[in-house]
């Protein structure tokens, strides 16, 4: 593993209704990036916010000497689609993702850059002493366990988006055109050298989490069905096992009927109903799982864009930080863009 040269660091942050936390987020992220001793840019992606987040991002990008790039999506597409939109607009040799809620402190960014410079393709993170409530922690643990078992990708904390990706890994992810994706797993599929570090975790200071219990459940379905066919194989094994169990149980009932007469068969009616309901439930579960896969195939075949960028606002060349100008990254002040 060889050291990886990093001249420009991009920090990509998806934003959805985070008006209250944005001023502190910008201040702390810029302060952390200034400690790097490298050129940097902060790419903030507004994912169809209903508050004033988009206005604040645009104002931040238009400041003199700002390193902020504001990417405004026309509506809400979801966290991972917003991150991919930020990837498209980023230019760094190393791209770091960070949530806007400040639960993962931006002050951890220099540690990620340090490990990535050692030659790692992907640097993940594990939330130490997680500060979320129990109803948030337990579903997250179930999601982590289910994904680890089904995908075989060994990661400890899929829900922590504070991660660093080498530029080549980002380009590989952008080349994938499937509609449903999960960035940490996708990145690990392309990475040769990966590592994880423990990072601090704080309570959410502003607003509420955008992930409800139902959204976590939907996320688990997305993870399992868009990244692996293991559930289909497991369903085949379960179906075969239940068919064998049903045959053996029917044979057992036949023997009992012959041995004890028809009266006993009448008493076993409720057992038969219970077995029938069990088999019907498994069949319906299998049909639902197949429907998930077919639905995702249909979405991929239509090949619609994963997101639509309404506008991108960057600093003018004269307003760019001197470090950015030295490496030659300049652009116009505002540019409409489509994926």
Swiss-Prot record:
Q: Mention one GO biological process in which this protein takes part, according to its record.
A: lipid A biosynthetic process
- Please explain the role this protein plays, according to its UniProt record: Catalyzes the transfer of 4-deoxy-4-formamido-L-arabinose from UDP to undecaprenyl phosphate. The modified arabinose is attached to lipid A and is required for resistance to polymyxin and cationic antimicrobial peptides.
Q: Which UniProt keywords apply?
A: Antibiotic resistance, Cell inner membrane, Cell membrane, Glycosyltransferase, Lipid A biosynthesis, Lipid biosynthesis, Lipid metabolism, Lipopolysaccharide biosynthesis, Membrane, Transferase, Transmembrane, Transmembrane helix
Name the Enzyme Commission number(s) assigned to this protein.
Answer: 2.4.2.53
Q: What reaction does this enzyme carry out catalytically?
A: UDP-4-deoxy-4-formamido-beta-L-arabinose + di-trans,octa-cis-undecaprenyl phosphate = 4-deoxy-4-formamido-alpha-L-arabinopyranosyl di-trans,octa-cis-undecaprenyl phosphate + UDP
Gene3D superfamilies recorded = Spore Coat Polysaccharide Biosynthesis Protein SpsA, Chain A
Task: Please name the top-level EC class of this enzyme.
Answer: transferase
Pathway listed for it?
Answer: Glycolipid biosynthesis; 4-amino-4-deoxy-alpha-L-arabinose undecaprenyl phosphate biosynthesis; 4-amino-4-deoxy-alpha-L-arabinose undecaprenyl phosphate from UDP-4-deoxy-4-formamido-beta-L-arabinose and undecaprenyl phosphate: step 1/2; Bacterial outer membrane biogenesis; lipopolysaccharide biosynthesis
Q: Which family does it belong to?
A: Belongs to the glycosyltransferase 2 family.
Q: How does it sit in the membrane?
A: Multi-pass membrane protein
- What organism is the protein native to? Pseudomonas aeruginosa (strain UCBPP-PA14)
Q: Tell me where the transmembrane regions lie.
A: 235-255, 269-289
Taking the record's annotation, the residue ranges forming a coiled coil are: none
Q: What protein name is recorded for this chain? A: Undecaprenyl-phosphate 4-deoxy-4-formamido-L-arabinose transferase
One Gene Ontology MF term = undecaprenyl-phosphate 4-deoxy-4-formamido-L-arabinose transferase activity
Q: Tell where it localizes.
A: Cell inner membrane
**Pfam families, per this entry?**
Glycos_transf_2
